[in-house]
Amino acid sequence: MLSPQRALLCNLNHIHLQHVSLGLHLSRRPELREGPLSTPPPPGDTGGKESRGPCSGTLVDANSNSPAVPCRCCQEHGSSIENQQDPSQEEEAVSPSDPGCSSSLSSCSDLSPDESPVSVYSRDLPGNEDANPQPSTLELGSPLAPAGPSTCSPDSFCCSPDSCSGISSPPGPDLDSNCNALTTCQDLPSPGLEEEEDSGEQDLATSELSETEDGRIDAGKAEPSWKINPIWKIDTEKTEAGWKTIEDSDSGRKTDENTNSSLKTESGKLASCLNTNSGSKIDAGKTDGGWRGDVSQEPVPHRTITSFHELAQKRKRGPGLPLVPQAKKDRSDWLIVFSPDTELPPTGSLGGSLAPPREVTTFKELRSRSRAQPPPVPPRDPPAGWALVPPRPPPPPVPPRRKKNRLGLQPIAEGLSEEGRAASPRAGEEASASQEPEEPRAHAVVRSSWSFAGVPGAQRLWMAEAQSGTGQLQEQKKGLLIAVSASVDKIISHFGAARNLVQKAQLGDSRLSPDVGHLVLTTLCPALHALVADGLKPFRKDLITGQRRSSPWSVVEASVKPGSCTHSMGSLYSQVSRLAPLSSSRSRFHAFILGLLNTKQLELWFSSLQEDAGLLSLLYLPTGFFSLARGSCPSLATELLLLLQPLSVLTFHLDLLFEHHHHLPVGLQQAPAPSCPPPALQQTMQAVLHWGERLAQSLRGTSGESTTDSSTPSARPPAGSWWDQLTQASRVYASGGTEGFPLLRWGPRRHGTTAEAAQEAPPPTEQTTPGRSVWLGRLFGVPGCPSETESGAFKSRRPSSWLPPTVSVLALVKRGTPPETPPEALVSSPGSVVQADRAVRALCDHTAAGPDQLSFQRGELLRVIATVDEDWLRCGRDGVEGLVPVGYTSLVL
């Protein structure tokens, strides 16, 4: 919508162009002008361009005003009054509400303030000009002229200079400048503007004359003249209480009003009528071009034309054509009704049958609305149950930021109320922008981004559920407690078979009843391991190495520091750390749980771990079990302690190395020889051992036993066995000397028994010289013989594919079988792999936290004795041994 000033100026310019176009059209075609003796207009035509009275002898001007009709106001006022132009009245002169002229707001030439549409229009008609300037209207609020023939009618706004001339004709006492019948001088009509509304808007009772679309004039009655009525301010002191508003949507409906005037509204139009009664009566004897009304007579229908466009349409139709019905009102332009400041009549003059007032928008109201601030929207309560922290007072509202729904930022769907679902991002497409609360920053403060690393399936969780304790995250934590509860129930049921205390003690001993050890290691230990590992940070910050991998065993290490636990827990930790067979952190954690069961301190350790807030914040994420149990869900910690409480009553004697003895990994279980090997493998092993003995004897030069044992290995190993394949493969390696042995390379093998080989060997065996034994060793590819390098026998050999292996099976057989290692030596076997000369350099000063650890200073060289696991080394310094953290040392190459 345009500003009020521009809208008023555009409307005046539009009226000005209509005046100019109509004047040019009439000046070029004089035949369109209506003469005095022309055919009278049809009864339905209420345009009333001229009257049949005394002014019917001359042509009319562009406003259909006859120059013969004198201006009643020209005799009294002088040139000073005529030359005055009131800009305030011109400001208040509004555009007509007629649809024909209200649908265009096109840009046109500006209308200067000193040129009214009438004055410009009158210049386009040559020959009708007069020396007298255009009379001006009275100023708003000025005192009215005295009653008499010289009183200036408000209709003089639209009169031409010709009609206002006093030379044309003598003034008539009952006609104004537009040939309109005037009332007595005591009556001053206060015309106004009426806007027609097809939709039935409220009608405000203002000072305006009635307007009808199809005003019908009876044949016997005089034609009413047309008037273009500006809007005048109402002088409430001069008017009596004669206001009346009539709303009628029925065509043909007649309403009787006051005795002084009456109106007729037709064709479904809403009209408001102003009846002004200043104590005068209508002259019934003078009916030329005016109204005819009497108290007892039928009211004459009157039509007031307020549109120049309607006048132009009537002139173009001609006198014989019917009136073109008005087009449907264009509601898009004339939504502003131009009305004076005094819009309402006096409150005491309103009748009882008033229609509801019409909504009238003035420039004054528009200015007040634009200056007024919009009413504050009442804040709405945010959806309940959104986060773990209470909502804070919101900062100044900002427009909410729309985000895409990502899989990593989905809210928890279970347990949400209807408000929570409407406000959650998943339901964002159902909730419109008008339903969002005015303080969106309250949710932005609550939605803290927590890391869910290490929690399975937690990448789909973007916010903890609510204070009520329901949600997928808490259901996951309850699942950990369910596993602990199931394992405790199985252990209690195992002890339920005992009849007395002695049987209970026997059922709790892993040496007497291994079932209890298996039950604890397969059910309780994995459940507690998963519970401690839940929400654990993957790495811990370290001063030297930067970060160290976290595990449940690192939680045990941090929880048993001096001053943070009892002495018994510290000694148990030292005992488990010294167990060399426990190489993994999981096996150490399981052994620690077994030790806590033996000392009945399992519940106590979990309770002390839960109370250490600094340790939990250092090791765990906010979504971990212990973090939630200490923060928002203390019921989880209480339930865990209640589940572990029955185990403190039972008596356990569990071996800390029970897992090492009974639950070895699959690779270690295959290392010892099977109890029942297959027969082919037994024969192969027997043949290897027997042949090794014979070969050793032959190399030593003893031949007495060869004949005695010649019949022993008569049983040849079956074809396809491991020993047969090894025998065939050994024939590939042949000596290149001059002994005359044929060179056989992956050809058909001559399968002979060891007895045949013994028959080939009598000549060398009879000679007890050491050279013969060297030859036999060289026959089987045994390296290290001094005669090979001296005689250069290997010079004629083929390339590397024919070279014998550096270490062969026969060379190992020559060395003999090592003595069996006692079982006690298996405990210290990992340390034997480490070389004795390995050393590490200390990177920092370290004080031993336990009796099994080694204290050292920065830069010292420590001798590595054994590798305990990936985190600890057993080192020695100055005859003192102990455990050293791997992260505090660097290997010396």
From Swiss-Prot:
Residues 95-117, 149-165, 702-714, 754-770 have a biased composition (Low complexity). It is found in: Cytoplasm; Nucleus; Cytoplasm, Cytoskeleton; Cytoplasmic vesicle. Residues 463-598 are annotated as: Interaction with TRAF6. Residues 515-659 form the RUN domain. InterPro entries: Run_dom, Run_dom_sf, RUN_RUSC1, RUSC1_2, SH3-like_dom_sf, SH3_domain. The keyword Secreted does not apply. GO terms for molecular function: actin binding. Associated component of the adapter-like complex 4 (AP-4). Interacts with IKBKG and TRAF6. Interacts with F-actin, acetylated actin, TUBB3, STX1A, KIF5B and KLC1. This is AP-4 complex accessory subunit RUSC1. The gene is Rusc1.
